[in-house]
């Protein structure tokens, strides 16, 4: 799988243009704030249906305009596939695959497989549990077709349960709570099992990568909401989650929120026996984040039997020569997009200069 060409119109600061890419390593260079990251963002948008920077869809429109449109031609097994994403202010976004409009962004997942590497990856390690849950949900959604559906159903039931907790406090009967709990357990257990299985694969990869890069040991500890060391048996997880919800009801009623479940989970990356978020140096944390993304790439490749497209947004300047060489070696044979301030110290198959939103192929 690779991106043959990209067309952008009114996307961020990028000028209206069509760009043709190489199958190998594509280097985009130029000064800061010229549009390098915006180019990668447009490709990632066609892959995931949202900005990797966390921006709202309306914020992707070029200043002074009222719409944007992005289109890519993807080559997959010698067949071309067209993906389009358009949005106009105060209207619904329009996403099409081969000319057919899709109903939700969830249908877009898997059409263009990408892995994004950026300096913000460090936040997965350094910040709070919500960052790691969000990252985990994003990764699993691409390789497990039912994961996003289960997550959406769970969140909907969770919201209704929290509303009910407040109503009970105000005098409503507790009897209906059991119905919500059964539904929450049903979807929650599926989420927990999928997370457990995914993190097992992550651990295998991270152990290998960290040992090869810096000769350090690593393990993943899944802090699941049911208190199990191995939460891969769905029936056992259901039973434990139901017990936890029942046991915690008084606390839930006190705070009007559900205190137990996948929405409160976390995972730790342990380096040399210590929690990397708390005890590792920034260099170790950066290496852990890099290994996490390389693991995402390996799992995506294995589970889909496809070649994902790699997007490296200004990460090479953050790596020493040893890590830079290791990353490029791992990504050999895959279409890769790399943004950098200069082309001098990177070897690529195609070079593009970006200035004021104009992409010039050399």
UniProtKB/Swiss-Prot annotation:
Gene3D superfamilies, sorted: P-loop containing nucleotide triphosphate hydrolases, RecF/RecN/SMC, N-terminal domain
Principal subcellular localisation of the protein: cytoplasm
A Gene Ontology cellular-component term: cytoplasm
The keyword DNA damage belongs to this UniProt entry's keyword annotation: yes
One Gene Ontology term from the biological process aspect of the record: SOS response
Subcellular location: Cytoplasm
Keyword Cytoplasm: yes
GO terms of molecular function: ATP binding; single-stranded DNA binding
Pfam families, A to Z: SMC_N
Binding-site residues for ATP, renumbered to this chain: 30-37
Keyword field: ATP-binding, Cytoplasm, DNA damage, DNA repair, DNA replication, DNA-binding, Nucleotide-binding, SOS response
Lineage: superkingdom: Bacteria
PANTHER family (UniProt xref): DNA REPLICATION AND REPAIR PROTEIN RECF
Stated family: Belongs to the RecF family.
Known function: The RecF protein is involved in DNA metabolism; it is required for DNA replication and normal SOS inducibility. RecF binds preferentially to single-stranded, linear DNA. It also seems to bind ATP.
Protein name: DNA replication and repair protein RecF
UniProt organism field: Thermoanaerobacter sp. (strain X514)
